[in-house]
Amino acid sequence: MRHGNGLRKLNRTSSHRLAMFRNMAVSLITHEAIKTTLPKAKELRRVIEPLITLGKEPTLANKRLAFARLRDRDAVVKLFAEIGPRFANRNGGYTRVLKMGFRQGDNAPMAYMELVDRPEVDASEADGAAE
């Protein structure tokens, strides 16, 4: 039975939670890695994994579903043009959550969430971007 296996409320109203996860999903699609608290990262997996699965099949209906959930045109374009084809041969497990200690102010457990097959950044490219 699935009694009590609901989602984490994270001390927010349902509309705030929806907006927060929508913003976090757009950030993860755009930057391919984000830093957040561990409970938010674990809950974000439930939002982002089905979106990436939608992105693997670029039909008009899937694009409309993704836009209804994300409300960000650039993120939807990147989802279907880059991220979906990248994970074409992977059946789920598109994200990785790495624990990274505790936040200074309130000791909240922090996590680094990233897409699994994220392209590596060379040291020379990173130096060029920093300058």
Curated annotation (Swiss-Prot):
InterPro entries: Ribosomal_bL17, Ribosomal_bL17_CS, Ribosomal_bL17_sf. It comes from the Bacteria. GO terms for molecular function: structural constituent of ribosome. GO terms for cellular component: cytosolic large ribosomal subunit. GO terms for biological process: translation. Keywords: Ribonucleoprotein, Ribosomal protein. It holds the Pfam family Ribosomal_L17. Belongs to the bacterial ribosomal protein bL17 family. Part of the 50S ribosomal subunit. Contacts protein L32. This is Large ribosomal subunit protein bL17. It comes from Bordetella avium (strain 197N). The lineage of its organism: Bacteria, Pseudomonadati, Pseudomonadota, Betaproteobacteria, Burkholderiales.
